[in-house]
A protein has these predicted regions:
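Histidine/lysine/aspartate-rich catalytic loop segments that bind and position anionic ligands
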Residues: 123-158, 165
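Active-site beta->alpha loop and helix N-cap motifs at the rims of alpha/beta catalytic domains
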Residues: 16-19, 24-28, 34-36, 41-114, ...
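Short, Lys/Arg-enriched N-terminal segments with co-localized hydrophobic residues
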Residues: 1-15
Length: 195
């Protein structure tokens, strides 16, 4: 199943970005050829379920010209940090390392960012988590809009709150990448809320 993620720098509309959230390389190639897709977020578990090696998929995406690929790492701090550095060294600036918003994930984000590695902090369910991720040096925060909605809260309101906080606090280095987006209306609403 593919999804579209949306991000926008609230200070510069020209930086609006669309990311695909899928492991389907044929679909990625199809949409990337439109010149409207700015990046891809991936999940190694989904890639492996398709019978492919995640690193082969990453290389195929880079060969297509995609230069912003969120590559998820898992484990404790040491595991995420070491794997994140390894992926960055192998794939260069095309690798944005995706970590969960957990204490170990935030610590890994901080250390990777110090090594100039771009990091996407995922599993954001509150403004407080987005603040911590920005403080840790994340390039992207990924609030899970659809999952927030599933739990009887307003995912778009979450994006709006994060956007307001980032704007008030002049946080410019961290972009909001709305995740778990399930339909076109939510993509539009996410952009309207500052993602």
């Amino acid at each position: 199943k593919q999804k579209i993620c949306a991000t926008i720098d609230v200070h510069n509309i020209d930086t609006m970005k669309l990311f695909l959230d899928t492991a389907d390389t044929e679909l990625i190639e199809k949409y990337y050829q439109t010149n409207l897709i700015d990046g891809v977020t991936t999940n190694p578990t989904l890639i492996m379920k398709s019978g492919r090696d995640p690193e082969d998929v990453y290389q195929q995406l880079i060969d297509l010209g995609i230069d912003d690929i969120s590559m998820e790492v898992v484990g404790d701090f040491d595991g995420m940090f070491i794997e994140g550095l390894r992926l960055f060294r192998k794939f260069g600036k095309s690798a944005t390392i995706k970590v969960p918003c957990t204490p170990d994930g935030l610590r890994a984000c901080r250390e990777l960012a110090r090594d100039l590695v771009n990091v996407n902090v995922t599993l954001i369910f509150s403004p407080a988590q987005a603040i911590l991720a920005a403080k840790a040096g994340a390039k992207y925060v990924s609030p899970f809009v659809g999952r927030v909605d599933d739990n009887s809260f307003d995912g778009i309101d979450l994006v709006d709150q994060i956007s307001d906080i980032y704007s008030i606090q002049n946080i410019r280095k961290t972009e909001i990448l709305a995740a778990s987006v399930r339909d076109v209306k939510t993509v539009s609403d996410s952009f309207g809320a500052g993602a």
